[in-house]
Amino acid sequence: MNATSQHPFALPYPIVENRLVVGGIPITRLAERVGQTPFYAYDRRLISERVALLRSALPSDIHLHFAVKSNPMPAVVQFMAGLVDGFDVASGGELKTVLDTAMPPEQISFAGPGKSGRELRQSVAAGIVVNVESEREVTLLAEAGASLGLIPKVAVRVNPDFELKSSGMKMGGGPKQFGVDAEQVPDLLTRIKALGLDFTAKCR
């Protein structure tokens, strides 16, 4: 019997003879091939189709970046490197994973509050863009750059003074843990310029 899962959130994997089929291979055979259960299985064709569908709905000058925290599995990240225009990471571990791909460092960005001094130094050495979220991070990046003989690449993650009412996620509108409050941005940009950091402006 052939069937397709009707679960509203399930990927369209077929079911053949009561066995889920992923990438044309029955799940039972995949388990034998992996050698253990549980395990994760992904269909490269479906991933490619989803990315292509998203691109078709967006203007051609929009760049797609994959948030690695959504799925940091190395095999998935390696595959995504050939489909998207860049990576966004949120930890030193994620950065290490993406640096093992063919993605150019300038297309990798590091965002998230509470970055450690070691992670910031790692970022400068790798030549990626760091989305700074505090004056502390700017200072640590400048120190790392001076020590390594490199110019840190930075952007500023701005916490705007307004809130999107239709969004379920509230990452703007008054003080938040994410980003620099809008009223503090001019002073921070002045400091970035004074320290000689390589600033880039982006819209995400």
Predicted regions and their residues:
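Glycine-rich, aromatic-flanked loop segments that form ligand/cofactor-binding clefts
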Residues: I151-E163
